[in-house]
Amino acid sequence: MGDTVVEPAPLKPTSEPTSGPPGNNGGSLLSVITEGVGELSVIDPEVAQKACQDVLEKVKLLHGGMAVSSKGAPLELVNGDGVDSEIRCLDDPPAQIREEEDEMGATVASGTAKGARRRRQNNSAKQSWLLRLFESKLFDISMAISYLYNSKEPGVQAYIGNRLFCFRNEDVDFYLPQLLNMYIHMDEDVGDAIKPYIVYRCRQSINFSLQCALLLGAYSSDMHISTQRHSRGTKLRKLILSDELKPAHRKRELPSLSPAPDTGLSPSKRTHQRSKSDATASISLSSNLKRTASNPKVENEDEELSSSTESIDNSFSSPVRLAPEREFIKSLMAIGKRLATLPTKEQKTQRLISELSLLNHKLPARVWLPTAGFDHHVVRVPHTQAVVLNSKDKAPYLIYVEVLECENFDTTSVPARIPENRIRSTRSVENLPECGITHEQRAGSFSTVPNYDNDDEAWSVDDIGELQVELPEVHTNSCDNISQFSVDSITSQESKEPVFIAAGDIRRRLSEQLAHTPTAFKRDPEDPSAVALKEPWQEKVRRIREGSPYGHLPNWRLLSVIVKCGDDLRQELLAFQVLKQLQSIWEQERVPLWIKPYKILVISADSGMIEPVVNAVSIHQVKKQSQLSLLDYFLQEHGSYTTEAFLSAQRNFVQSCAGYCLVCYLLQVKDRHNGNILLDAEGHIIHIDFGFILSSSPRNLGFETSAFKLTTEFVDVMGGLDGDMFNYYKMLMLQGLIAARKHMDKVVQIVEIMQQGSQLPCFHGSSTIRNLKERFHMSMTEEQLQLLVEQMVDGSMRSITTKLYDGFQYLTNGIM
């Protein structure tokens, strides 16, 4: 049995400020501050910072037993158990010193002692302020990350590291890129404060382990190769991949050999449990893949696993628990690289379908899509539904993935394979409402095979680069398919007040819906994704479910993901975090701006996965397929100017346009052609592709000099320059900017921390962070901000550079 990493017990927040600190491991920072602490109402940042410094001086005295006084003399604690501990000098002059020096030495010693007592008296009233801040309701994960990054004192850093255990997992997960970037590129004290939490969470969650391994590899890639090989980030990554952080209770768990009972819905368990020779013959998407059972190396590029793995008990051959998932992701990446070598879109599509058909031979397996947000096993990829997306030099592609939801990914058995020709003979099960189905009912609805923790048959356990996935969570719930005539009817259910709708209104709305059903796009060999993306998501789910051998199972779900090779998605991940933070700020400040952050999975420095935006197509595809202006397309899709559907879509357009205009201004988003702006079925616009932000622009052309993209077509949809909705748009811009600058620090710190040690083009230049802060205009009054918004709107609308860039994209890439 190998040495295991001992994690600290999770800390529990104290309910009373006067109680001892959570997770006080004896003689820590908080043992210095034992005074009564009242509820914090107002905190002066300067006072808090000063108090922090004072407290840390006491920490040094406690932990080091010796410190240096303001005069440079070493100090010693006499009673080092509280704030009132006495301090005496250690450099009292010995008796042998010359008599003429005695008086001077005594004076210095006396002055030092008096100075220490004076500082102690002056600071005693302030030393509890830092603790008050840390234990107040104001102290959230954002503030914790800020203190961890900005504090130079090991005591505060260690305390913040312990406090991470007190926050919700999802709150800390949002800042995982920042935590790992600090771990890689900052000093050892920060790394030592962060590591216990990372180790603890890796033991608890296989998905967290995977994401840490991928991000550690991606963010270490900016280091020099000689430094990278021996860096702390590489060592932690090897530790995670070695499976040393596997939950202790599962380390020596032998596979159960008892057969699982069969049910009437599925074939015998032999369907999934194949022999090694069968499994080897049926897989290999790459001809040179080697099975880990005979090759203990996890990756080609890693020289060896951490030395701790050598002591793992080898009484039975146990593959690393992350290896099947990493092999699954590696296979998807390899497909993308092979597609990029083909010349035409049609050839790429045919190759993609055949590659995914081979992939299905290894499913179901103990693999998952990390962006789903719920535990599940991947059972099938409907290969004929995959499409290659538009790209001039690369071959990103979109796939749909069928999964079976489960209660626990690690402990639930992998579902048995159902052959493609074994489509269900009855549809009674899928027609049942799913609202009342429990996890037990879901788990029992399909036959299983034993839970082989070392199941070689589950997936080929080969090595893989740094990889991972992201996708939208989709629950197809029959209880959600309820016709809703208006928002009023929903409100009436919540308020319990009766709302009467005239029969004529119902008939009118029904006729409007029938008259203006969404138009279907024609198939274009040069743009096959347009048809797939235009199809409503619920219709796609229903269609794929009907053709799937697993579709009759009540826990069946459909997910989707875009696979990208040759693109660095670390900037995309940074943009996602900023958008998510702005979305939270606007919700908190009750500003009705609308943006759609989509999930990003960084697999390596040149590959990743993206969550597709469902029910949305690009404005380029809209204009190319319909040959209409944007306003005419709105009228065609949603009805005439006075219909409820059009007015709702127009409002959605305005709220989303204002939100993304602010995002583009604050982040300086470039490459805003119509292929990178989507339009969804409800009228929202969604900006995608944040590869050029802050200090970078495409090919350094400098075409786009306006604050954001606001074309005449956009203004026409809003009702023109004199329309009420255009004024509403400018009002939302002002409200959104005012709200954002109130929380500027939350936005700026996301970017600032990721600049540490980074070689990303968005950070080129020394003034990136300063310019970002200046765009919040903290010194302006609201009247000045209103004038600024008017100027930006007018300048963007009249911008000749926007028109030039759109023309450039049309001539070079055919983007309308």
From Swiss-Prot:
GO terms for biological process: phosphatidylinositol phosphate biosynthetic process; phosphatidylinositol-mediated signaling. It catalyses: a 1,2-diacyl-sn-glycero-3-phospho-(1D-myo-inositol) + ATP = a 1,2-diacyl-sn-glycero-3-phospho-(1D-myo-inositol 4-phosphate) + ADP + H(+). Pfam families: PI3_PI4_kinase, PI4KB-PIK1_PIK. Keywords: Acetylation, ATP-binding, Endoplasmic reticulum, Golgi apparatus, Kinase, Lipid metabolism, Membrane, Mitochondrion, Mitochondrion outer membrane, Nucleotide-binding, Phosphoprotein, Transferase. Residues 52-242 form the PIK helical domain. Residues 535-801 form the PI3K/PI4K catalytic domain. GO terms for molecular function: 1-phosphatidylinositol 4-kinase activity; 14-3-3 protein binding; ATP binding. Residues 668-676 are annotated as: Catalytic loop. Residues 541-547 are annotated as: G-loop. Residues 1-30, 101-120, 248-318 are annotated as: Disordered. The modification Phosphoserine is found at residues 258, 266, 275, 277, 284, 294, 428, 511. This is Phosphatidylinositol 4-kinase beta. It comes from Plecturocebus moloch.
